[in-house]
Design a protein with these regions (language model features):
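An acidic, phosphate/nucleotide-engaging active-site surface
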Residues: 94-170
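Histidine-anchored nucleotide/phosphate-binding helix
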Residues: 58-79
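Structural motif
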Residues: 43-45, 132-133
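Short glycine-rich anion-binding loops that position phosphate/pyrophosphate groups of nucleotides
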Residues: 49-52, 139-142, 184-185
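A short helix->loop->beta-strand "cap" motif at the edges of active sites that frequently abuts
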Residues: 80, 171-178
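C-terminal functional extensions of proteins
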Residues: 185-313
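Short internal beta-strands
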Residues: 81-89
């Protein structure tokens, strides 16, 4: 089944059926992978960080951080420059995860002001190797009211830099290809979803659903899995030697190291609910690390089998 099987694995129902969102985005995972690998002098930015004010302590959630790390590691291993981007409230956890990467990446942290984001945008579009692709993973988008919202409707404006301005801004012509990865409908990239899906499939969709689109949308049951899916898809369309480099650190052991850094050093949190604050813990979207490791292992086994079959044919 090739990359379609990857889409199936990362889109398996966990708590909420995302079937229609997944079907809407079918084929875009492969297209995004091919876009990155076919671009000469590629330079990929990765935007992440979803801040939870009522956590103890106030911190970003664990989801998105591991997916960012696996994408960054794979691309850097291939020799593609990577710039990881976040904002001040999420900076400690994002930085902590980048310290575990096998190769160095650039790290850009903005303040909460639009001016700071636009200044970064100008820098990314110039220089010796301008950005060619920008990936958002588990990064909240403003909704139609112009405000970013949590899944139950809380306004996140006071804790969220307008990093969506790297994807869309009136009277600005975007110079890079954009990819959005999300699981809940309120993340950057989900703005392409049809109104029917927003209204019927996303809890509080009329309030929280993303207004910011992306060229390619990757839908997964956990956002981290979408990042894993992109690594898998890139390996499956890459030549043999490039595939090996992309997969060199695509292992459960590395994933555990990324999550450990996020939690122990960065104080990233999970299990946030209206009536119970999130706390630092080794889980993502209320699933234990061991459960996530099983999914990563299945992806890796599928990719390895696909590449072995391709080699024999």
């Amino acid at each position: 089944m090739g990359i379609a099987k990857v889409e199936d694995i990362i889109g398996e129902t966990v708590r909420r059926d995302i079937g229609r969102m997944k079907r809407f985005a079918e084929g875009q995972l492969e297209a995004a992978a091919r876009s990155i690998l076919s671009t000469p002098n590629a330079h990929v930015g990765i935007v992440t960080g979803f801040f939870i004010r009522n956590a103890v302590p106030p911190s970003p959630e664990t989801d998105g951080l591991g997916g960012m790390a696996h994408m960054a590691a794979a691309l850097a291993n291939l020799g593609i420059p990577v710039t990881v981007i976040s904002d001040a409230p999420c900076s400690k956890a994002v930085w902590a995860v980048t310290t575990e990467l096998p190769n160095g990446v650039a790290l850009e942290i903005t303040s909460l002001s639009a001016a700071s984001v636009r200044s970064l945008r100008d820098r990314l579009s110039t220089g010796e190797r301008p950005l060619t692709h920008l990936v958002a993973i588990e990064r909240v988008s403003p909704a139609r009211d112009g405000k970013p919202h949590r899944e139950y409707g809380a306004d996140m404006s006071d804790d969220t830099a307008p990093l969506h301005l790297l994807f869309d801004d009136p009277d600005w012509r975007r110079p890079w290809v954009t990819i959005g990865i999300g699981d809940g409908g309120n993340e950057i990239g989900m703005g392409v979803l049809p109104e029917e899906i927003v209204r019927e499939d996303i809890p509080n969709g009329q309030l929280i659903s993303a207004a910011v689109s992306a060229d390619y949308l990757i839908v997964s049951s956990v956002s981290n899995w979408g990042g894993w899916g992109l690594v898998s898809a890139m390996a499956m369309v890459a030549p043999k030697e490039a595939a090996a480099r992309l997969l060199a650190d695509f292992t459960p052991d590395r994933d555990r190291a990324y999550l450990t850094a996020a939690v122990d050093v960065g104080q990233a949190v999970d299990d946030s609910r209206i009536d119970r604050p999130a706390t630092p813990k080794m889980s993502v979207d209320r699933l234990s690390w061991e459960q996530h490791a099983q999914v990563l292992g299945r992806l890796r086994a599928h990719v390895d089998g696909y590449l072995a079959d391709r080699q024999r044919s």
